[in-house]
Design a protein with these regions (language model features):
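A generic "folded-domain core" signal
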Residues: 2-143, 147, 161-192
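Short, aromatic- and glycine-rich surface loops/edge beta-strands on solvent-exposed regions
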Residues: 152-163
Length: 192
């Protein structure tokens, strides 16, 4: 004969209530930390661009750039109109590169009418300092342009050294604007 013992005893109900309340409390507490997700993919997101930022650039900002399709590399190069692209002077041009196959964007320091390595000079605290930039990979170029960006934010006057000639770099107002807008557009594309 089956026993008539109650299955849900008061002690069991207390235990169920405690574990139920604790689990709900844990869910609520962990929901506050939901915004941070670990990136376990092993993928480097340094140069990653989102579709929204790419479309913003293409629809609103790309009109200020000269576009060059590089179908062999699957990339599109953008050079700002303010750099005076038709000029024959020695200078540096910031090239914004969109690689839509990898959803990545790069910023390249392109020498015009000079060769690598690029040598720059500037004055800081009354002393002339030199920068030497070598042609390298995308990480090297990002490091170089961020170093240049920091100097330009400090409003340091840069000079390009070519065979002991000191050529003012980005001295015209249109070139300064081109550098500024290229930096702004690039860092908006990669959202860094």
């Amino acid at each position: 004969m089956p026993s008539k013992d109650p299955i849900l005893t008061p002690e069991l109900l207390k235990i169920i209530k405690i574990f139920g309340a604790a689990s709900i409390l844990l869910v609520v507490v962990f929901s506050f930390f939901d915004s941070y997700r670990a990136n376990n993919s092993g993928e480097d997101r340094t140069f990653r661009m989102t579709s929204a930022s790419r479309l913003y650039f293409l629809n609103l900002k790309a009109i200020n750039y000269v576009r060059e399709n590089r179908s062999d590399a699957g990339m599109v190069l953008y050079r700002h109109n303010g750099f005076g692209l038709e000029s024959e002077e020695e200078t540096l041009i910031l090239v914004l590169i969109l690689n839509s196959q990898k959803d990545e964007s790069y910023l390249y320091l392109e020498p015009k009418n000079i060769d690598w390595p690029i040598r720059l000079s500037f004055e800081e605290n009354g002393q002339t300092r030199l920068l030497n930039f070598e042609n390298g990979n995308k990480f090297d170029h990002l490091e170089q342009v961020t170093e240049l960006q920091k100097l330009l934010e400090e409003e340091v006057k840069l000079f390009l050294l070519d065979e002991d000639q000191k050529i003012p770099l980005w001295s015209s107002e249109s070139e300064k604007d081109a550098v500024k807008f290229t930096f702004e557009d690039y860092f908006r594309i990669i959202e860094n």
